[in-house]
């Protein structure tokens, strides 16, 4: 039987991660473990999740730390604290690892990485096998609804189709490439062609699209240069995501189904001209 352990979790600006922290806290406590959630938004000292209460909790060492997307384990201060306590640090990447090269190169000593995509696991093994000795796949699943809350039949539900996520126009995301490379330069053209390739074939990963484009250009680069180019591909990753997101939403809007959009930026979406497209205003508290 596992001995009682002391866990550290985090609150941040990302609601989905905060929801996961609450779920983990509940499960850990049910199993008899101690849990402290540190609010990185730096609330007042009297707040139960403040840095003051964190310091008091750390008077006795923590056994394990659970992070999402490196939040709570990539900062120098936290690396020093976790190494001093000998804590096992579990980092769960919900987003592509190409966004977290620096975290995978510098992290606490007892660092265990999990990815929610098998291709992401292979990416880490391929490019960061030396600095990240342990990486594994963790399925991304939902949670069982409370038994106390009745299941609402589909005919009685408030929304036909609800999309939650931030809206950006994809061309606004591509601007980041212009900020890194002069328009018309060889590097700019390479990323431009890479994006076109992703539009034509949605099955491609960012890595495969870059490798194919390098072959098209006849370029041979070192592994370190390739890693740098992959890191710079974050802008392309965002651009193709927003392009495909808008494509899907346009299709739903034109289908005539009642579509509800929740998130930042949707007031700038051109499809709101459709009478069947509705914006859910405000912020929805995940705890409700």
Give the residues covered by each predicted segment.
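Conserved catalytic or regulatory cores that recognize and/or transform ribose-phosphate-containing ligands
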Residues: 130
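Extended catalytic core of nucleotide-activated donor transferases of GT-like folds
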Residues: 6, 10, 17-127, 144-150, ...
